[in-house]
C-alpha cells in the first residue's frame, strides 16, 4: 500500500467514526431526513452513552423534559452504555428521572458502571433491564483534590457525604439493607446481568424483545 493510499484510507476511517446514520421518513408532505438519534427520540428512546459529564447530562435532561411535554403518560426508554463519570452531572439526570411524570424504563447495553449503574437502577420499578452480556459495576465515589490541608479536609468530608447519600439511594432502589450496600461498594464490584437482577439493581434480563401481539 502506498503512503498516499494509506493516508486516504485513514481519513476515510476517521470520517466514518464520526458518521451519524440518516433515515428517510415518507409522508403525504414528502420526504424528511432525520439523524438516527432524532428519529428514535420520536419513539421516546434516549441514549446515555459514554462518560457522564455536564454537557451530556444537559442533553439527556432536555430530552426527558421534551418527551414529558409531548406526552406525560407514556414511558421514556433510556438506553445506558456508560463507564460512569461526574456525580453532580449524574445526579441532575437522576433527579429529573424522579421529577418527571412519565416512567423512565432503563436498559443496559454493554456496560453500566459507577454513575451509569446508579442511573440504571434509578429507573421505574419493574422497568429496569439488562441485555444478557451487559456488565454492571458499583463502587464508592472517587475524588482527588490538592491544596491547603483545611481545603483537603473540606473536600474529603464532601466526598464522604456524597458516598453516604449514594448508598442510601442504592439501598432504596435495590431493596438491599444499607450495611450490605456499604460493604459491597467499598471496592469495584462487577456483576453479570443475572447477578445484577438477583441483587436488585435491575428487574429482568432481556434475551429477546417482547413484541405486542
From Swiss-Prot:
Signal peptide span: none
Assigned GO CC terms: cytoplasm; endopeptidase Clp complex
Alphabetical list of CDD domains matching this protein: S14_ClpP_2
Keywords: Cytoplasm, Hydrolase, Protease, Serine protease
Catalytic activity annotation: Hydrolysis of proteins to small peptides in the presence of ATP and magnesium. alpha-casein is the usual test substrate. In the absence of ATP, only oligopeptides shorter than five residues are hydrolyzed (such as succinyl-Leu-Tyr-|-NHMec, and Leu-Tyr-Leu-|-Tyr-Trp, in which cleavage of the -Tyr-|-Leu- and -Tyr-|-Trp bonds also occurs)
InterPro entries to which the protein is assigned, alphabetical: ClpP, ClpP/crotonase-like_dom_sf, ClpP/TepA, ClpP_His_AS, ClpP_Ser_AS
Subunit structure: Fourteen ClpP subunits assemble into 2 heptameric rings which stack back to back to give a disk-like structure with a central cavity, resembling the structure of eukaryotic proteasomes.
Protein name, as recorded: ATP-dependent Clp protease proteolytic subunit
Native source species: Pseudomonas putida (strain GB-1)
Amino acid at each position: 500500500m502506498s503512503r498516499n493510499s494509506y493516508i486516504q484510507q485513514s481519513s476515510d476511517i476517521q470520517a466514518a467514526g464520526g458518521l451519524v446514520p440518516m433515515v428517510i421518513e415518507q409522508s403525504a408532505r414528502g420526504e424528511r431526513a432525520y439523524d438516527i438519534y432524532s428519529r428514535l427520540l420520536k419513539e421516546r428512546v434516549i441514549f446515555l452513552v459514554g462518560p457522564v459529564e455536564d454537557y451530556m447530562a444537559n442533553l439527556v435532561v432536555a430530552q426527558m423534559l421534551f418527551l414529558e411535554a409531548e406526552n406525560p403518560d407514556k414511558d421514556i426508554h433510556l438506553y445506558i452504555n456508560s463507564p460512569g463519570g461526574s456525580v453532580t452531572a449524574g445526579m441532575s439526570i437522576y433527579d429529573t428521572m424522579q421529577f418527571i411524570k412519565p416512567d423512565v424504563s432503563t436498559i443496559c447495553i454493554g456496560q453500566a458502571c459507577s454513575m451509569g449503574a446508579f442511573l440504571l437502577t434509578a429507573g421505574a420499578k419493574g422497568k429496569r433491564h439488562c441485555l444478557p452480556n451487559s456488565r454492571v459495576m458499583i463502587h464508592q465515589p472517587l475524588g482527588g483534590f490538592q491544596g491547603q490541608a483545611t481545603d483537603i479536609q473540606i473536600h474529603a468530608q464532601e466526598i464522604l457525604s456524597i458516598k453516604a447519600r449514594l448508598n442510601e439511594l442504592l439501598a432504596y432502589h435495590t431493596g438491599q439493607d444499607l450495611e450490605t450496600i456499604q460493604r459491597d461498594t467499598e471496592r469495584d464490584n462487577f456483576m453479570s446481568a443475572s447477578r445484577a437482577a438477583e441483587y436488585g439493581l435491575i428487574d429482568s434480563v432481556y434475551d429477546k424483545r417482547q413484541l405486542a401481539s
